Amino acid sequence: MERNQRKTLYGRVVSDKMDKTITVVVETKRNHPVYGKRINYSKKYKAHDENNVAKEGDIVRIMETRPLSATKRFRLVEVVEEAVII
């Protein structure tokens, strides 16, 4: 599979406590099949962060890759927006 055909997702980092691993929550909206109301869905993915660049609260782009561990199937591509520290 070519790199440009792999799944690419945007999400927010909710945990960076593991070494070289981040937890990213991806939020999507779907219509209810019967009532048509927009419903928010969220799913957490573990992603490989080789250089420990991403911090908690950052908006990141992750890409599908080969299995890197028992739970990791994505890798960090870029940090789109850094978190604002208050």
UniProtKB/Swiss-Prot annotation:
Keyword field: Ribonucleoprotein, Ribosomal protein, RNA-binding, rRNA-binding
GO biological process: translation
GO MF annotation terms: rRNA binding; structural constituent of ribosome
Source superkingdom: Bacteria
Transmembrane segments: none
Coiled coil: none
Signal peptide start-end: none
Name of a matching Pfam family: Ribosomal_S17
GO cellular component: cytosolic small ribosomal subunit
Listed InterPro entries: NA-bd_OB-fold (IPR012340), Ribosomal_uS17 (IPR000266), Ribosomal_uS17_bact/chlr (IPR019984), Ribosomal_uS17_CS (IPR019979)
Subunit structure, interactors included: Part of the 30S ribosomal subunit.
Family stated for the protein in its record: Belongs to the universal ribosomal protein uS17 family.
Known role: One of the primary rRNA binding proteins, it binds specifically to the 5'-end of 16S ribosomal RNA.
Protein name: Small ribosomal subunit protein uS17
Annotated source species: Streptococcus pyogenes serotype M5 (strain Manfredo)
Name of the gene encoding the protein in the UniProt record: rpsQ
